């Protein structure tokens, strides 16, 4: 997409969208407002031309294969989750955990949700959907607020995914670092070695993961979360009276079919197959990509670098769905018509989320067209001294991610800016740690994404937990 420089006015669309989301509690309308005003600015103030461009931009989201795959596998995940619910997988899991004393306590339930979040690390949105769907019945039974569940969903998604190279997030970052390696900006270090060295230095992500376990174990509730938890315990209300859940419970939570027995395997087998397929998918797409790039005898890094994270995740969800269908056929759980109806019902339940993702992608596109991220980065570049480079890179990355709602877009902007700058400093015999600066980009991007009300991960967390979105953002912010 063509990118121009519009100066300080480039930050108006994200600022407007965030302000409207907080003021109106309507994320969809807020994103639409940000998209529209952005394209009006791009059109030189012409509202008619801006409106036409805004409509085209929302349609053109599907022109990007990666974005389209994310939307498709999110809808398919809705189908898989509802089949697991109706097919007795979720009840089977809940029956299994109910045998253990720890599952009957608030601490145990929160720890269970946190551990599930660690285990499903293939993609942040899938982590949120699985944790929310599996944990919500137990949290409601124990009167744990939906805001707390949304916090656990959010804090075990992006912060966990960014610490691992073998998932969609790792593949994206390695691809960006490989582009810098081709320009000679990594010196004698490989992209994978830089990524792995940056992991323990990614203080925000590491601390976010540690904190969610501390909160789960100690039940440490502060600020708005303390109010939400007190309401849930004393009044038995898991939602505030004025809450507006992103999706109603009855849309995304259906009971097990009466003739179907609870079976733990109906949840674990599809999820395990999905995770395995993601690893295999990265290997397959990476091998194909390496061959197309004329890489002879590709190694592990070459395969990971050439692999497609979004394709692998989509294959994983498709395999999980196929396994769930196979199990149901073997168990004679559903008729073919029931399969079709449930699949569409599950995808339909996720549809509001898919719409929000389209709008979030479209807002990111208008920010790219206006040069929002590059303008913010260029504004602080004169202040990037060797001592301040890592802290400022973190702050700028956080601001861009918060404003645009995308950590991946932030990575693309800031790695392109920060890595060559570090290379320049090092060529002048001024030592600046490249892994530290890369970790600042990644940590800042996750921090901004974690806090932003227009972030897709935050919206998915709210939806998966059936929580009010702005309540989720407000209660999570003190921890973030």
Enumerate the language-model features and the residues they cover.
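Hydrophobic core segments of alpha-helical transmembrane domains in multi-pass membrane transport
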Residues: 12-23, 34-41, 73-82, 114-118, ...
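Re-entrant/interfacial helical elements at transmembrane boundaries that shape
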Residues: 92-95, 126-138, 167-185, 212, ...
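Hydrophobic transmembrane alpha-helices of multi-pass solute/ion transporters
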Residues: 2-79, 92-96, 100, 273-358, ...
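Transmembrane-helix bundle segments that line or gate the permeation/cavity pathway
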Residues: 128-132, 136-140, 148-254
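Alpha-helical transmembrane segments of multi-pass membrane proteins
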Residues: 106-120, 144-170, 185-207, 228-231, ...
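Long, contiguous bundles of hydrophobic transmembrane helices that form the permeation core
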Residues: 208-306, 318, 322-341, 464, ...
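Transmembrane alpha-helical segments and their short flanking loops
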Residues: 45-58, 166-204, 211-212, 294-298, ...
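Membrane-embedded alpha-helical segments and adjacent helix-loop junctions characteristic
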Residues: 48-150, 333-428
């Amino acid at each position: 997409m063509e990118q121009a420089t519009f100066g300080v006015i480039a930050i108006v669309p994200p600022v407007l969208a965030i302000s409207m989301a907080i003021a109106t509690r309507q994320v969809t309308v807020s994103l639409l407002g940000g998209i529209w005003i952005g394209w009006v600015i791009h059109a030189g103030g012409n509202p008619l031309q801006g409106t036409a461009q805004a409509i085209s931009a929302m349609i053109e989201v599907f022109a990007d294969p990666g974005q389209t795959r994310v939307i498709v596998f999110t809808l398919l995940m809705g189908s898989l989750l509802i089949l697991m619910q109706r097919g007795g997988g979720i009840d089977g899991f809940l029956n299994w955990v109910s045998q253990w004393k720890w599952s009957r306590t608030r601490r145990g339930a929160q720890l269970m949700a946190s551990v599930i979040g660690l285990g499903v690390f293939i993609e942040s949105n899938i982590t949120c959907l699985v944790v929310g769907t599996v944990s919500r019945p137990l949290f409601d039974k124990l009167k744990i607020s939906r805001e707390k569940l949304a916090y656990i969903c959010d804090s075990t998604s992006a912060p966990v995914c960014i610490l691992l190279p073998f998932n969609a997030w790792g593949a994206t970052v390695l691809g960006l670092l490989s582009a810098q390696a081709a320009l000679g900006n990594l010196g004698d270090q490989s992209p994978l070695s830089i990524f792995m060295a940056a992991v323990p230095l990614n203080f925000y992500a590491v601390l976010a993961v540690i904190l969610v376990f501390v909160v789960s174990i100690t039940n440490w509730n502060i600020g708005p979360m303390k109010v939400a938890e007190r309401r849930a315990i004393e009044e038995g209300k898991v939602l505030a009276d004025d809450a507006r859940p992103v999706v109603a419970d009855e849309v995304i939570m259906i009971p097990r079919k009466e003739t179907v027995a609870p079976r733990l395997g109906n949840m674990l087998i599809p999820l395990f197959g999905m995770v395995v397929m993601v690893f295999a998918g990265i290997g397959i797409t990476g091998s194909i990509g390496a061959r197309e790039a004329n890489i002879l005898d590709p190694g592990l890094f070459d395969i990971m670098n050439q692999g497609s994270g979004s394709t692998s995740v989509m294959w994983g969800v498709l395999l999980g769905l196929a396994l769930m269908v196979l199990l149901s056929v073997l168990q004679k759980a559903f008729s073919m018509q029931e399969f079709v109806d449930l699949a569409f019902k599950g995808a339909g339940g996720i549809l509001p989320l898919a719409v929000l993702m389209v709008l979030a992608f479209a807002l990111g596109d208008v920010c790219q067209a206006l040069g929002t991220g590059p303008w913010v980065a260029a504004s602080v570049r004169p202040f990037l001294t060797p001592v301040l480079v890592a802290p400022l890179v973190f702050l700028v990355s956080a601001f861009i991610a918060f404003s645009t709602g995308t950590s991946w877009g932030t990575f693309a902007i800031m790695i392109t800016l920060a890595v060559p700058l570090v290379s320049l400093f090092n060529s002048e015999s001024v030592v600046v740690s490249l892994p530290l600066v890369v970790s600042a980009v990644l940590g800042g991007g996750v921090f901004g994404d974690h806090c932003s009300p227009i972030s897709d991960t935050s919206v998915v967390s709210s939806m998966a937990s059936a929580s009010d979105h702005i309540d989720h953002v407000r209660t999570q912010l003190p921890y973030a």
